Each structure stands twice: as C-alpha cells, then as structure tokens.
C-alpha cells in the first residue's frame, strides 16, 4: 500500500453490514489494510507540512477499525498488536521533554547530545528539574489504540517540588459498546474496571466536553506519563486536535519510565522479569508503595502515584530545584 492507496482506502464509505458473515481471514485482511493505512497516514501527516488531508480522516479510519474489531471478538483482537502503538517516544521528543523538564532550550540540549554522545542518564541528570506539569494515565480495552476503547482517564497538575500538592484533578469513566455487557470489559484482569463502571457512560470518542477539557490541559503544560508512548499513541487516534497540537509543538510528552531507567541505578542490576521500571516496582523502591502494595491501574490514582514517585526519585538524586 502506498500513500495514495491509504488515502483512497480511508476515504471509502464503510458499510459494516457488508462484512456480516465474513470469515475470519477476510476480517483480518480488512483490519490489516485499515492499520497499514493508518500507519502511512500518520507518518505522512507528521513528515509533511501540507499533507493534503486532515487528521480527522485518520481518526475516522481508526473508529472504523474498532467497529470491525468488535465484530471479531476480544480473543482475535488481543492475539497480536497493531503497529500503531509506538514502543517509545522519538529522539526529538526526548530532547524536547528534557528541555521542558530542565527549562532549557532544545537546541542547547541537542548540542550536548552531539558533543558528548550523551546517554539518557546523562541528559536527565545533567540539570535539576523544575516547573509545572500535567500527569495523565489512561486505562483501555486493548493494547492497540486502533482496536480498543479508553474506559478511564485521569489527570492532574503538579509542580515538581518536595512538598507540592496536585491540583485540577479529574477522573472520568468512559462507555464502550453494549456487547461488552455480556462478554465483560476487555483487560479487566489488569485494571479491574467492570461493566458497572462504564455502563451508561459517554464513550470517550463521543464526549466533546471531555475532549475540550483534556486538550486544554495537555496544551497548558508538558505532560508526563509512565510509558508516555502509550498515552501518546492512544490520544493520537482518540482525541480530536491532539495530533495537530503535537505537530505544532503545543503538546510535549515526557516519559517517566525513561526517567526511572535513566536515574535509578537499581534498575540496571535487576532482572528484566522483575519489571524494574514498572511504576509499581519503582514506587516500591522509593518507598511510596509498601513492598506488598500494588499499583491501582486507575487513571488518576496512577497519575498521582507517578508524580509522588518521580519527586522522590528527583529528591534522591539531588535533582529538585
């Protein structure tokens, strides 16, 4: 598939009833085409100042793909992962995030990287952190942003200071299609969100007021998330206006998992199986959670845990200004 094919595919009128009774191979083929088109369109949108299409075309295709996945069932959806979930933020994103965290110019941070082949540890530890940030966490029905739904989102604003208290906290449960009343909320074994939590709630994609409020918060301050590439990938395909603001540099993501790996020396001596950079393990090492205490896996709770753990880490490394 080339870019022209992707635009044509995304622009085609979709009639779900044409796929009723289709075998699994046909459904998987259609899903694969959708996801390849999304990938090509996202790449072109960010690479080209004038891509020739609006990002609403991409979001509409992602909506279409979710409807298709609802027809396939959760087992097929979770069997593999869409290519539209990023594994990490880009190098440019990391430079912008470090600059925002340390209140420095991006160009200055970039010069340091070129001059000393700086590792992430050197970057994050080179200057104290300061300022005000918005933290966010989402809970979803899939790992793939073009296959599942956001069922919970929480965010709050925090200043990076030892005795700081959060402000402007918000937590919202979001609805999903009625078919999940019988089958249950996918990934509930992780986030413990049940049908009763989302029953009669407005779906995220349909909540215009939530879109407006969340986009405003994300543009007001750089945002932090633990594995920020996850939130970034999901918001890209769910929140209208997010991709445009990201492209314009009005939204800056910062990954606290990167900060954990860069600053906490214990991570390097722990096994991969122990998930040393997980929020739960990090919070336990910094004494924010007890050794037998677990992460909640709810948006606002995890956001607050992330901020408290980050501040404890920065204090431990003498990086709080």
PLM feature spans:
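N-terminal accessory regions of nucleic-acid-interacting proteins
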Residues: 7, 19-20, 54, 65, ...
């Amino acid at each position: 598939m080339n870019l022209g094919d992707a635009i044509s595919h995304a622009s085609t009128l979709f009639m779900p009833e044409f796929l009723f009774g289709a075998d699994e191979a046909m459904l998987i083929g259609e899903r694969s085409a959708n996801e390849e088109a999304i990938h090509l369109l996202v790449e072109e949108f960010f690479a080209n100042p004038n891509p020739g299409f609006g990002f609403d075309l991409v979001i509409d295709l992602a909506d279409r793909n979710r409807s298709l996945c609802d027809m396939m069932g959760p087992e097929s959806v979770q069997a593999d992962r869409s290519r539209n979930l990023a594994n990490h933020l880009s190098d440019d994103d990391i430079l912008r995030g470090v600059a925002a965290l340390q209140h420095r110019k991006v160009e200055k941070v970039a010069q340091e990287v070129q001059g000393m082949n700086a590792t992430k540890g050197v970057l994050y530890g080179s200057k104290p952190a300061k300022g005000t940030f918005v933290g966010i966490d989402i809970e979803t029905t899939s790992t793939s942003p073009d296959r599942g739904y956001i069922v919970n989102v929480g965010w709050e604003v925090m200043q990076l200071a030892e005795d700081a208290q959060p402000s402007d906290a918000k937590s919202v449960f979001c609805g999903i299609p009625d078919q999940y009343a019988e089958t249950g909320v996918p990934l509930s074994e992780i986030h413990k969100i049940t049908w009763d939590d989302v029953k009669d709630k407005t779906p995220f994609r349909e909540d215009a007021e939530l879109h407006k409020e969340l986009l405003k918060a994300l543009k007001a301050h750089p945002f932090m998330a633990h594995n920020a590439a996850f939130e970034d990938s999901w918001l890209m395909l769910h929140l209208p206006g997010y991709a445009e603001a990201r492209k314009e540099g009005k939204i800056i993501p910062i990954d606290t998992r990167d900060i954990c790996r860069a600053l906490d020396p214990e991570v390097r001596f722990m096994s991969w199986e122990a998930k040393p950079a997980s929020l739960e393990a990090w919070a336990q090492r910094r004494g924010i959670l007890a050794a037998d205490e677990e992460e909640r896996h709810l948006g606002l709770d995890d956001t607050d845990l992330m901020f408290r753990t980050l501040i404890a880490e920065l204090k431990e490394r003498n990086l709080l200004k």
